[in-house]
Amino acid sequence: MENGGQYDNARFKPDYFKGAQSMWNMIPQHQIKEQHNALVMNKKIMSILAERDAAVHERNQAVSAKKEAVAARDEALQQRDKALSERDKALIERDNAYAALQHHENSLNFALSGGKCVDGDDCFGIGEPHKLEVFPLSTIPPEVTNTKVVNKRKKENKQGLSKVKKVGEDLNRRVPAPGKKSRTDWDSQDVGLNLVTFDETTMPVPMCSCTGSTRQCYKWGNGGWQSSCCTTTLSQYPLPQMPNKRHSRMGGRKMSGNVFSRLLSRLSAEGYDLSCPVDLKDYWARHGTNRYITIK
């Protein structure tokens, strides 16, 4: 019986373990697969979210870098504008200094030359040298030895030089062109006249048609203008001679800012429409475009 019981126990043991295994295998297989798939999907979602966060972070960094670059560009543009304004101021100061120096040299040369222009042009604009009645020593008779006579002649010569200087102060006074008024006449009539200043916003740039074709003038000095249509051909009024070059003249017809303001005032009083460009052909100083000629 014992052997039989042991046999029986041994026979029923596997059935007991089979029952225990069936209890653990009660969850269906498709639910296990779904749980596995859910874990995989969660991992994928987490990786996608991490990638999105990294992309957003990179985008924010790029936006901040762009803002910094824009700020640096704006600062560079401001520095460039400041440098350009300083350069323009330096150019204006240089032009003013050059104009003042040139005017001082011309006035000094005029005074030292005794009324005769050193630049080779006649101060009266007619192309003929003005001869002073100065008696050379060779023409003085030998019997004239009285010091009073010599002193009298010196006084007469000084008076002649002073008269020439007074007339030579105004180049346009000696020989005014037909139908034109000299500068002294303008100054005498400008008393009490409201001067019209040039306004770039409402007035066009003046023109010049001295060569037959109308061309725009360039700014010169403090409010003045210079013609751009001067050529190397001969003109009615020669340009001043260059001080450092023997056979060359200064290029361009020039007009100072004060003269241009008086011209605008005169034209406005005569009823000229200042919204149209002014032709400065007939208003330049008495010198012109023959720059490269032999000066005798």
Curated annotation (Swiss-Prot):
GO terms for molecular function: DNA binding; protein homodimerization activity. Pfam families: GAGA_bind. Keywords: Coiled coil, DNA-binding, Nucleus, Transcription, Transcription regulation. It is found in: Nucleus. GO terms for biological process: regulation of developmental process; response to ethylene. Residues 66-97 form a coiled coil. It comes from the Eukaryota. Expressed in seedlings, leaves and pistils. Detected in the base of flowers and tips of carpels, in sepal and petal vasculature, in anthers, in young rosette, in the lateral and primary roots, and in the whole ovule. Residues 55-90 are annotated as: Alanine-zipper. GO terms for cellular component: nucleus. InterPro entries: GAGA-bd_tscrpt_act. Alanine-zipper domain is involved in homo- or hetero-dimerization via electrostatic interaction. Transcriptional regulator that specifically binds to GA-rich elements (GAGA-repeats) present in regulatory sequences of genes involved in developmental processes. Belongs to the BBR/BPC family. Homodimer. Heterodimer with BPC4. This is Protein BASIC PENTACYSTEINE4. It comes from Arabidopsis thaliana (Mouse-ear cress). The gene is BPC4.
